Amino acid sequence: MAATKSKAAKKGAPLLGKYELGRLLGRGTFAKVYHARSLAPGADPVAVKVLDKPDLAAAGAGMATRVLREVAAMRRLRHPNVLRLHEVLATRSKVYLVMELAPGGDLLSRLASLPSRRLPEHAAQRVFLQLVSALIYCHARGVSHRDVKPQNVLLDAHGNLKVSDFGLAALPDSLRDDGRLHTACGTPAFAAPEVLRRKAYDGAKADAWSCGVILFVLLAGHLPFDDSNIADMCRKAHRREYALPRWVSQPARRLVSRLLDPNPATRLAVAELATHPWFKRSLSLDSQLGSLLGGQPERELAFQAPPPLNAFDIISMSPGLDLSGLFGESKRRREKRFVTTASPERTVERLGQAGAKLGYFMVGKKGVERLPLGGLSGLVAMSMEMSEVSPSMMLVELRLEGGDDGDGDGGAEEFGWEELRAELGDDVVMAWHGCDGGKKDKEGILL
């Protein structure tokens, strides 16, 4: 019966009463991916990965483990540049992974369609920004991808990146007693030398090497190390036998060199990329708004003297007086505020660092005015306003301005406010509104 239903679903009949499978998007050894229409009113189309249980069983325990690992990894990840897993369905003979649709195809195909097979450096910066933002997020949650390559980087309808295929991902329980990984996996042309030599390795540092290869491909249009003999390719990688074209800038060359360092101990980590001059420019507010909006972005977030709070504002912060009920539920989900004694510069710096991990970027008031209605293709923009409580204390108000999923709530219901609070730390957040269930926060201040 289940097998009959699965076969019928391919002909247009509803899949378990929830989805209608359409055209075939792609196929692998053990899976087929279909374009599908959700039967829920107003829902976006999805991609459904169909796996045959008997085929998985015949392939041995390794393939089934890979599927389980992929599901486990994707379920703990929710980032604008990570392909989202909506749900997992199953019948007696099939497993269905219902995922976000990425109609733009993969990055390799997109590059292959270009005459030069490469991107201009400013465009490569934007692509690399999204890739690294996704991997910083994954690593912060204990997930090492281990197969980062252009084929596993998909594009949505607006050209935004979606990291996919977590079948080889390593989770915290994959680590041995020495705290390292020992399974050699991935695609040789993008795998780190220590992985190819079957040594114990750090998954995040291995992903950093793969990022270096991808950056090289984006800038040069070809692989840095390309040899059918894996031993020879590994030897070239250790000797750094690669050559970037003359048009690549010096900052970009230095970044590639730091990432394609055969010594993992001195190799630049993904989380450290924000400090590199070439990448720091693309992480700036100016670069992000310029590439995303196509206009003239703000040159900086001006640190003007925050306006003082009036008497009503201060009274509303008093212990025992909670005015949150005066505001709608949607507003409470979209807006948070906290008290800080940190400087404005320090506060914005920490918010920006947290954004690289959590998938948002900061904008000023002028930047908010230029944001297109409906958000930035899933990216989340956050605006901030500071008000002076006392000469040494400020109230910081945060508001989600982008990432609308179509419900008018800007993705606020799913935004990780608690994660943001943890990233900012107690040295920045003195008291936080809306996270303690109305209990008194530190220093006796209730917001």
Swiss-Prot record:
SUPFAM superfamilies in the record:
Protein kinase-like (PK-like) (SSF56112)
InterPro entries cross-referenced by the UniProt entry: Kinase-like_dom_sf, NAF/FISL_domain, NAF_dom, Prot_kinase_dom, Protein_kinase_ATP_BS, Ser/Thr_kinase_AS
- Where would I find the Protein kinase domain in this sequence? 19-279
Catalysed transformations (reactions): L-seryl-[protein] + ATP = O-phospho-L-seryl-[protein] + ADP + H(+); L-threonyl-[protein] + ATP = O-phospho-L-threonyl-[protein] + ADP + H(+)
User: What cofactor requirement does the entry state?
Assistant: Mn(2+)
One GO MF term attached to the UniProt entry: protein serine/threonine kinase activity
Task: Tell me what induces its expression.
Answer: By salt stress and abscisic acid (ABA).
> Where does the record place the catalytic residues?
D147
Q: What is its EC number?
A: 2.7.11.1
Q: Which residue stretches belong to region PPI?
A: 333-362
Q: Where is the NAF domain?
A: 297-328
Asked whether the keyword ATP-binding is assigned, the reply is yes
Q: Where does ATP bind?
A: L25, G26, R27, G28, T29, F30, A31, K32, V33, K49
The protein's role, per its UniProt record: CIPK serine-threonine protein kinases interact with CBL proteins. Binding of a CBL protein to the regulatory NAF domain of CIPK protein lead to the activation of the kinase in a calcium-dependent manner.
Q: Which family does it belong to?
A: Belongs to the protein kinase superfamily. CAMK Ser/Thr protein kinase family. SNF1 subfamily.
Q: What is this protein called?
A: CBL-interacting protein kinase 7
Q: Which organism is it from?
A: Oryza sativa subsp. japonica (Rice)
Gene symbol? CIPK7
